[in-house]
């Protein structure tokens, strides 16, 4: 596209021609207009809300070049591939290029051949890059994953702090846009200050992603729980996050033995193997990615239908960001967290052994305290009987509804139960043994277990021994968890976790206090809706289609895979599942009708339109 042609086009024409959309989503147009008028912006928008378009459209309408600062090579490659497929001249500059490739790309940039250049923050202050930008007309800088600039953020990158130094060395200051999906108020304030944004237009569209269903389970056998879900979603792709490399290897190996299409990703693999495994997942050659949190930031794969956390993450920010990798196309997606008490201990170990964040010991201690508070909030999320979505939104400073109708708590049946007797027994048992043992010993004592450990510790002589023998152990564990949430007790996160009393415990032990709590009516705490699912070879994305439409959708998916292999691009870059579903429902029969489908722009139609029309014409 020639510069003159771009500048004659309106934002709506650019939106339709290059991206295939007829209208902007919530908040997009406001940020586009601000950047076009020369105002800095700060956009906090949930994953899948279309942050990229907020700077890509101004980039095509403004003169000169837009630089996009991006933290990950995979994200840059993904975005550039998507833009090139849409007919936009874009490139990336990072360490994946050889010296010759880098110089060639930089030369093309100086000649004005690109409208959008993605660059790693580490490259900004290199002499070669600084020299090159002096002769470029840089009209805008967009900072992607802007939370990386904040030490309050979950992915702090010191290299992001160099962005303002780079801007100061440009001949003229360009307009600056900062974008992220997950940022508390502290992080937002940091972004504004550390990027020196000038009276920015701020947009926080909200953190709620209504297409995500949230589920928390506390299964006895995590692998069995995960496999049960996977068996019901054979046609879908998803991510399983584990806390440790060992977990990744174990889960991946077990799934391979069961015949699943699975690969893995963690920092212990070679660069080449990580790259190959990531591409296998992105190109749909493998359906399941088992990974540590080293995988995912910047992955733009739109057709991920589920994320399973095999272990509880360290904080709500990480949890919600990783959940955001499912359902980016706006179609229904599921997010499942499998909790066990060991997860808290593992995370606490990571906090205690985290790298020195500051030369000042006091600052390091404060950072660790902050991380421990975040871990506590994350743990309480796993225990709550309230709406999970509302818990998440309140954590990020928003207020939702007490009932979302799309989380495991809202879909389960609860009753309010007086648990005073059990709560007092738990607290009394802990006090009588002088707060020396962990949850398993305490619960086994109350249940009257006759084990070697109970006898060794003389817990069979505790006055509360066997007092709650008729209560299911899982219910006792629920009550103990609730006592933590209400701060009657806490469980240390040492190698051998110990149950300790807090001052508030005396309110129940020594006074006439009562304790009521919500408890699931059924012993199985998995929602009924989840139990009624059956095996299907059709993607969950197509669940609302008729049988005929679902069959057409699967044919379109097969064609997309063929074209992806032929053009060597990820399938979702050709067309998203959402676009294919609209095709299956509306069955366009000519170019005009095909261009009316959301996500089909002129450039995409020229490349792929005819094969899809031919597929739709088959009966």
Where are the language model's segments positioned?
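Short, charged low-complexity linear segments at domain edges
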Residues: 366-396
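Accessory DNA-binding and partner-docking regions appended to nucleic-acid-acting proteins
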Residues: 2-11, 359-361, 370-372, 388-390, ...
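Catalytic cores of large soluble enzymes that bind and process phosphate-bearing ligands
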Residues: 97, 179-183, 218, 269, ...
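Short alpha-helical segment immediately N-terminal to, or the first helix within
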Residues: 34, 309, 381, 582-583
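Helicase motor core with emphasis on the C-terminal RecA-like subdomain
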Residues: 2-18, 22, 26, 30-52, ...
């Amino acid at each position: 596209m020639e510069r003159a042609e771009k500048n004659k086009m309106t934002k709506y024409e650019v939106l339709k021609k290059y991206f295939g959309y007829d209208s902007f989503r919530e908040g997009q147009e406001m940020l586009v207009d601000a950047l076009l008028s020369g105002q800095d912006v700060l956009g906090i928008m949930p994953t899948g809300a279309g942050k990229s378009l907020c700077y890509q459209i101004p980039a095509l309408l403004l003169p000169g070049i837009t630089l996009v600062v991006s933290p990950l090579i995979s994200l840059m490659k993904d975005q550039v591939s998507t833009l090139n497929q849409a007919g936009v001249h874009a490139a990336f500059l990072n360490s994946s290029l050889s010296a010759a490739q880098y110089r060639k790309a930089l030369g093309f940039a100086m000649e004005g051949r690109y409208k959008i250049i993605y660059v790693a923050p580490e490259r900004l202050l290199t002499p070669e890059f600084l020299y090159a930008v002096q002769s470029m007309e840089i009209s805008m800088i967009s900072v992607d994953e802007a939370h990386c600039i904040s030490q309050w953020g979950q992915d702090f990158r010191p290299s992001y702090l160099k962005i303002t130094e780079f801007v100061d060395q440009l001949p003229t200051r360009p307009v600056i846009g900062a974008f992220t999906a997950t940022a508390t108020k502290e992080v937002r304030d940091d972004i504004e200050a550390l990027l020196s944004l000038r009276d920015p237009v701020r947009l926080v569209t909200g953190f709620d992603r209504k297409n995500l269903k949230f589920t928390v389970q506390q299964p006895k056998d995590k692998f069995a729980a995960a496999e049960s879900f996977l068996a019901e979603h054979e046609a879908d792709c998803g991510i399983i996050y584990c806390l440790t490399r060992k977990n990744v290897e174990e889960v991946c190996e077990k799934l391979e033995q069961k015949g699943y299409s699975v690969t893995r990703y963690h920092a212990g693999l070679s660069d080449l193997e990580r790259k190959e495994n990531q591409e296998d997942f992105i190109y749909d050659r493998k359906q399941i990615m088992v990974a540590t949190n080293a995988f995912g930031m910047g992955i733009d794969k739109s057709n991920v239908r589920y994320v399973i956390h095999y272990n509880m993450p360290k904080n709500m920010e990480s949890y919600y960001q990783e959940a955001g990798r499912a359902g980016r196309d706006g179609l229904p997606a599921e997010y499942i967290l499998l909790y066990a008490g060991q997860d808290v201990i593992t995370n606490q170990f990571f906090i205690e052994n985290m790298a020195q964040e500051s030369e000042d010991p006091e600052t390091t201690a404060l950072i660790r305290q902050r991380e421990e508070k975040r871990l506590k909030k994350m743990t309480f999320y796993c225990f709550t009987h309230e709406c999970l979505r509302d818990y998440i939104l309140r954590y990020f400073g928003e207020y939702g509804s007490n009932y979302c109708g799309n989380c495991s708590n809202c879909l389960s049946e609860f009753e309010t139960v007086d648990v005073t007797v059990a709560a007092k027994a738990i607290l009394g048992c802990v006090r009588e043994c002088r707060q020396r043992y962990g949850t398993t010993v305490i619960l086994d004592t109350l249940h009257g277990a006759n084990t070697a450990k109970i006898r060794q510790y003389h817990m069979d002589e505790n006055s509360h021994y066997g007092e709650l023998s008729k209560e299911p152990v899982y219910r006792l564990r629920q009550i103990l968890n609730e006592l933590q949430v209400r701060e009657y007790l806490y469980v240390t996160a040492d190698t051998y976790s110990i149950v300790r009393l807090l001052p508030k415990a005396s309110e129940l032990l020594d006074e006439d206090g009562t304790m009521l709590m919500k408890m699931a009516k059924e012993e199985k705490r998995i929602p009924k809706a989840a139990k009624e699912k059956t095996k299907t070879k059709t993607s969950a994305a197509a669940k609302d289609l008729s049988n005929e439409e679902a069959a057409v959708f699967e044919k379109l998916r097969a064609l997309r895979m063929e074209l992806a292999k032929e053009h060597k691009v990820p399938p979702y870059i050709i067309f998203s599942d959402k676009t294919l579903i609209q095709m299956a429902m509306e069955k366009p029969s000519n170019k005009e009708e095909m261009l009316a489908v959301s996500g089909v722009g002129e450039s995409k139609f020229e490349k792929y339109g005819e094969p899809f029309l031919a597929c739709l014409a088959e009966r």
